[in-house]
Amino acid sequence: MTTARRRPKRRGTDARTALRNVPILADIDDEQLERLATTVERRHVPANQWLFHAGEPADSIYIVDSGRFVAVAPEGHVFAEMASGDSIGDLGVIAGAARSAGVRALRDGVVWRIAAETFTDMLEATPLLQSAMLRAMARMLRQSRPAKTARRPRVIGVVSNGDTAAAPMVDAIATSLDSHGRTAVIAPPVETTSAVQEYDELVEAFSETLDRAERSNDWVLVVADRGAGDLWRHYVSAQSDRLVVLVDQRYPPDAVDSLATQRPVHLITCLAEPDPSWWDRLAPVSHHPANSDGFGALARRIAGRSLGLVMAGGGARGLAHFGVYQELTEAGVVIDRFGGTSSGAIASAAFALGMDAGDAIAAAREFIAGSDPLDDYTIPISALTRGGRVDRLVQGFFGNTLIEHLPRGFFSVSADMITGDQIIHRRGSVSGAVRASISIPGLIPPVHNGEQLLVDGGLLNNLPANVMCADTDGEVICVDLRRTFVPSKGFGLLPPIVTPPGLLRRLLTGTDNALPPLQETLLRAFDLAASTANLRELPRVAAIIEPDVSKIGVLNFKQIDAALEAGRMAARAALQAQPDLVR
């Protein structure tokens, strides 16, 4: 880790020096360079501002002096990135055509503008420059295809909004990042930045420092500590690919830099239960406690090494998830994000609470130790059960905890009966999110949530791997419970040991054939109706774990030991096949 602390000082880079550092101009002689330097115009381009749009006349080229720019195709995808020394717009000038793509500043930048007429005159007089331009055209054609992977964040702003000093936390984050690559820290004295009166002073003073740090490091942490001043805070927000905001007060301040709402944000929570209005204001992609575990998880997200675990629904078979988690964690696999549907949602919430595998398994045993949670049958008006036992068990397990206050990432999936939409729960009550996700239609009453009527997400997405894989911060392990269906032969309303006589079976079902009880039929229907997308075709899937739960009844929660062992065995096999899961 390297740290840069400096005072603002105007750089004053002259045009001749800047142009000489451009690769395509390296072969022109000093006289031509001097003549060109007298015609260029220096411009400051604020962060997020467009330098030009697709379809505009190609009336000039630009040489990047500082900052970072991206080329954006008319369809919206980014296909190239430009930094100090790169030229922008030269191909359009040579072709005499309109701009084929737009260019936008990722952060505050400085460019030198060369008029099209000036550049074409020089091009005709300099054969070596023509060769350089041909090479540049070939490079641009290679880069014009859409990128298959998201660009990783490199400049990370760390902002303190209250009285907590950022420096110790920045050191902890940088130390955690050092295990993944090289990290630099730019943290000028607060008494210096707070005294600056003009924003352009900061751009001039720190652009070169930031460019140099970015070229020689994997990540750069730019720090706006308490008392650093509003201009510096805005500068940090403008330069950053992502922001880390320190939360040390219950409610967010009235004034939050507008750029903070335009960048992906991670929260570091310095208090146990910040108000959800922080999430309303900043819509963070993740939140982490201000401790070593939280700093490590944040560093893994920044580095793209944050591992997710997504788990399928499956009734009692979902107890296998606890065995999978035990085997993975005991082998040293670190998991930061959890998500699932139905029984997978229960396991995800337990793990996101911060329980280790032993505690989670003990809690699962307690969860099923009493009477059957689905044993409060009633007149089937909205469901076969009242749902009261399920409500009490879920509330007793998760209490009033909010998803915003969980130490690890979590989501669950339910389905809205009103709209038919998939609902992804990332905010609000953990108990409510779990309860909605396990509300098997016809068996457990649905959940009212405002205008929504929520039921088990297995109807639409029993293994929401696509939801987890949409997060670009790391790979994903999937636990798939789909197996051959082996129906039981009893009646769901009778004890399993009771085998109904043929006459009674015929009276109740209209057939002599043994049919599965209604509950099993409903759960199996979920497997058939849910998405059958090929998990291996999804991006970022690191492993697919498939416990053999075919001999476990979907409603037989007393088979917990068999389910746990099935999970352990499947995870053990995955680790043997892919030892790189341990990082």
From Swiss-Prot:
Residues that hold a nucleoside 3',5'-cyclic phosphate according to the record: 24-140
Ranges where the PNPLA domain occurs: 309-469
PROSITE patterns: CNMP_BINDING_3 (PS50042), PNPLA (PS51635), UPF0028 (PS01237)
Residues spanned by motif GXGXXG: 313-318
Keywords: Hydrolase, Lipid degradation, Lipid metabolism
Keyword Lipid metabolism: yes
Molecular function as annotated in GO: lysophospholipase activity
Motif GXSXG positions after renumbering to this chain: 340-344
Family, similarity comment: Belongs to the NTE family.
Protein name listed in UniProt: Uncharacterized NTE family protein MT2641
Organism: Mycobacterium tuberculosis (strain CDC 1551 / Oshkosh)
